[in-house]
Amino acid sequence: RPVRERHAADLLAWTETALAATGYEELSLLTLSAGDYASLTWLLQELMDRGSQRQVAISLPSLRADTLTPEILAQLKRVRRTGLTLAPEAGTDRLRRVINKNLPEEVILTSARQAFAAGWNLLKLYFMLGLPTETPADREAIPPLARQILQTSSRRAQLHVSLGNFIPKSHTPFQWERQADLEECRGFLHGVKDGLRHRQIQAKWNSGAQTWLEGVFSRGDRRLAQVLLAAHRLGCRLDAWSEHLRLDTWRQAFQETGVDPDFYLRQRSPDEVLPWDHLDSGVSREFLLAERDRAFQGLETPDCRRAGCQDCGVCDHDRIDLRLDAAPATQPAALAAASAAPPQPVRYRLTYTKLETARWLGHLELVGAFYRSLRRSGLPLVFSEGFHPLPRVSFHSALPVGVESLAETLDVELAEILAPAALPDALNRVLPPGVKIVDAIRLPKRLSPPRLELSVYQVESPEPLFDRAAAEAFLARESFPVTRRRPKAKLVVADPRHLELHLRLREKDNVKVMDALTHIFNLSEDQARDLLILKLRSV
């Protein structure tokens, strides 16, 4: 409070700048409630008109079921169907009214039915456990609601159900409420997740220990500073990841500092002085108490954007007031090029280096870097068909992590005929350090990727590891432990620190250069890790 909305024109300009600078293929519009943004439908259509040719998909955070419309779904699926999350939050209409989410079950089912009809096969649902006034019946209603949502699909749909534990927060109507303790949270979760056992439902939940700790700090006071320092000294790190959270160590920190964590999870009296009372959020204490009473009666407090001011105390209607964005009067025109016939692709072959720090990029990471760089370059790309369109790029080989190369190759398809010299100029400005286009040629239409037969490597070691006798013994062998037959290889040992390795390639079961060197010269893992391997060429 008060509601403040950014202008759609500003959002369009910022997204254009961000996409051009990063080359990302997905854009997320982040807000607490995306469906409540006044210009959402207009903004989505304009973003998709601009981004569909570049195959940029749009995703939204969790939506209230009553704000999901066919128009929003139609825009979201224009490139690909990104994840869709609905937030029923509670299993019954009664409990949703308590938290001022007046969502009848039929509205939730209608939204799910629309999403499945629009082609989504997976929906994500979010529920909270331990809400104020919650009863076992409210929790028991969650699995049946999930199954009803599944039944709104005519196909074999999937549901991902996330279960979170309620944590009272300061400056809210529930800031006085008790938070469920660790054992209660485990009990709530046990009953619900058992009811969600279904081959088409995947349930996820937050760690009860994380909820307990977050609850303590959410309504804590300055005494928790010494607890935080003690926990750090005891070795607590990265506690947001459940595998790193050490609850016993946190309990030790509370014990050493003499602070009772359960003190912060208890029910508070409305007359109690709260640790955050000296902070003025604008919302009066009287308004929060009145909202608390309305919640327990199941009475809705309407949205002040639609039903007028509710006198929360934030707005003075002079300097501070609602700031809503008015959608343009007319819908944006779709770009003419979007409906044009697809262009005839033009293929180019690029030769590039992978040196220095770039050698630590795995092949999939390198592919991702090229995809983003191609988008950032502004070149007219051609995209693949299917669920997840990507730039049409074909890599001729996958270089092992840690190996450098002077001459890797890939083929890329463009929508226009360009001078080959223009491609290195466009790409080298945006490729990561160590990756550089050194040659580009235009290919005939039907030319297949080359079948590589030989790779030549230059290998250097900081210590004398390459024994000429070991190389000669290897070349004289009939078999090799890594494969069923000895790979065709040529070794030239210049001195014990330098060698040149020629590896003959086959259609399958090729030996990795590191494996070959390790077995030929009986190297340890540490010795192999210190080698500097440079791929000179492939033919």
Language model features with spans:
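Radical SAM enzyme core and accessory elements
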Residues: H198-S339
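Conserved SAM/AdoMet-binding glycine-rich loop
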Residues: E16-G164, P168
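Flexible glycine/acidic-rich beta-alpha junction loops that bind and position SAM and/or redox cofactors
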Residues: A38-S39, L68-I72, R94-I99, L129-A137, ...
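Core RNA-modification/binding signature centered on pseudouridine synthases
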Residues: P342-P345, G368, E472-V539
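Residues forming anionic-ligand binding surfaces in small-molecule and nucleic-acid pockets
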Residues: S339-E356
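Short, charge-patterned binding micro-sites
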Residues: N165-S170, L381-A415
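Ordered, amphipathic secondary-structure segments that act as subunit-interaction surfaces
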Residues: L406-Q458
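Short, conserved charged micro-motifs
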Residues: A358-R359, L418-A426, E463-L475, E507-D515
